[in-house]
Amino acid sequence: MTMMTMMMVSWSAFLQICWILMVRANQFNPGEPSGCRTNTPQSDLNSFLWTIKRDPPSYLYGTIHVPYTRVWDFIPQNSKQAFQESSVVYFELELTDPSTISALSRCQLLPAGQNLQDVLPPELYLRLKTHLEYVRLMLPSWMTPDQRGKGLYAEYLFNAIAGNWERKRPVWVMLMVNSLTEADIKTRGVPVLDLYLAQEAERMKKQTGAVEKVEEQCSPLNTLDFSQVIFALNQTLLQQESVRAGSLQVPYTTEHLITHYNCGDLHSIISHDTAQVPNFNNVTLRPSDQVTAQQIDSYFRRELIYKRNERMGRRVTALLQEQPHKTFFFAFGAGHFLGNNSVIDVLRREGYEVEHTPAGQPLHRRSGWRSADPADTDAALQPFLHHSRHHELQLLEGLELLEKVEHKLKKKHRRNKLKKQRQFNDLWVRMEDSVTAEAPPPLIHIINGYITVQTHPQEHERANHDRTFSGSSSRTGPALSALAVCVQMLRLLL
C-alpha cells in the first residue's frame, strides 16, 4: 500500500494547506518546482528530526508518503544515525503487519450487499465511471520505460489500484481517484519512506510498534457526513475532468511538496496556528459550497487534528514512561510535529523537553558516552546506509491479491513466524484491494495496490544502484480545485 509526504504531515497541516490553497488559489503560478532558494547544500537543509532530551535520548522524525528514493539522499546524516542508534521504532500503524492491510481494506468497503451505484447520485456515478475508463486507456502511455522493463503491464496495474472500486465507500473512491494520475502512476514500484523505514527496522532486528489502531484512522473518514463526502468527490472529479480537458493545471503538485520537504521548509506553506480561520473574501466558491467546506473543516479539526495528535502524544508519553532506559525513534507524518496542537506540544505539556535537531548537529548521548568521532559514526552507520539494487527490488514480498493475502500470510505465520515478510504502504491512498485482478506475472509484488517489482538476479547490475541507504469541468476554477489538491496533500503528508 501506499510521511512528511502520502504523506507520509498531520491533519492540521492538511487543513491549513487546504485553506491556504482555497484563499490564494488565484495567486499560484503553476510550473515546475524550483530548487532550494539558498546557497546551502540541499543535504544540509532537510531536518525533520526532533530530540526528546532524556537519558537516553529518544527521537521524533517526520516522514513523507512518497517513494523513499525521491527524498533519502537529502535526509541529514544525523537523522539516519538516530534511526540506527534507536532500539525501538514506532510508526503510526503496524506498517508490515498483514492484519493491518486486511483491516485497512475492510474499512473501505460499503456494507454487505451495497454497491457504489446504489449510493451515489446517478450523474456523479456515470462521471466517475467515465473517468476510470479514461484512466484505464491512458495507463499504458503513463507508465515509464523502467516500469515496463520490470514487467509491469497496464491492465494489471489498473486492477491493482482500482479493482473492486464499485464496492468501496465514496470517500475512499475519492482518494483513489486522486491517486490515479500520471504523476502518481509513475511512482509505483518503490516503497514510500515510511514503509522503507519499517522494513529496515525489521531487517535490523529492532523492536517495532504503532501508536494508532486502524480503526482510529479509518473511522473519522467513514463517519464524515455523506453530503460532505459527495461534495468532496464531486470536486475531485471536477479537477480531474478539467485536467483531462486541458483547462486546468494543478497549482500545487507532489513535486512541489517533495522540493519543500527536501529543502526543509514545509513551514513556508503551513500556517503556524491551527486555530486561525482564513479570510474567505477572495474565495470563488459559491456561498453554499463555502458553508460545506467550513463544515468539513470544523469536523476535521475536531476529529482528525486535535483528537488524533492528543491521542498519539499520550501514547508516546506512556511508552517513554514504561521503558525509560530505551531509545525510541517515532516516525510519523511530518505534520504531526508542525504547528500548534502538535504531538510535540502534548509531550511538552507532560514535562518533556523537545528540541529541533538541525542537520549537522551532533546527537545527544547517554551520560558517560564520549563525543562521536566522524570515522566512528561512519562505521556505526554502515549497516544502516547499505543500499543495492538487489535490496531495493526485494523490499516487498507477496504475489497474492488482497483477498488472498490475509489468508495465505496468516497461514504462513502460523507455520513459521520467522519466514514471514509483511507489507504496508501509503496509509490512505494505496490501500486499494484488487480482487478483480488476475494472477500477476512472477516477481511482481502487489499489496493493496502498491506495487514493487523484484527483477531476476541478472538484472540487478545498474549504473545507479549505489544510492545511499542504504459535473462539468467548466465550473472548476482555481478555488474549486483546492479541495482536490488538499486531498493530494493529505495522502502525502499525514
Swiss-Prot record:
It is a single-pass type I membrane protein. Divalent metal cations. Mn(2+) or Co(2+). Its cofactor is Mn(2+); Co(2+). InterPro entries: TIKI1/2-like, TraB/PrgY/GumN_fam. It is found in: Cell membrane. Residues 1-25 form the signal peptide. The keyword DNA repair does not apply. Keywords: Cell membrane, Glycoprotein, Hydrolase, Membrane, Metal-binding, Metalloprotease, Protease, Signal, Transmembrane, Transmembrane helix, Wnt signaling pathway. The keyword Transmembrane applies. Glycans are attached at residues 234, 282. One of its GO terms (cellular component) is membrane. Pfam families: TraB_PrgY_gumN. Residues 26-467 are extracellular. GO terms for biological process: head development; negative regulation of Wnt signaling pathway; proteolysis; Wnt signaling pathway. Residues 489-494 are cytoplasmic. One of its GO terms (molecular function) is metal ion binding. It comes from the Eukaryota. Belongs to the TIKI family. This is Metalloprotease TIKI1. It comes from Danio rerio (Zebrafish). The gene is trabd2a.
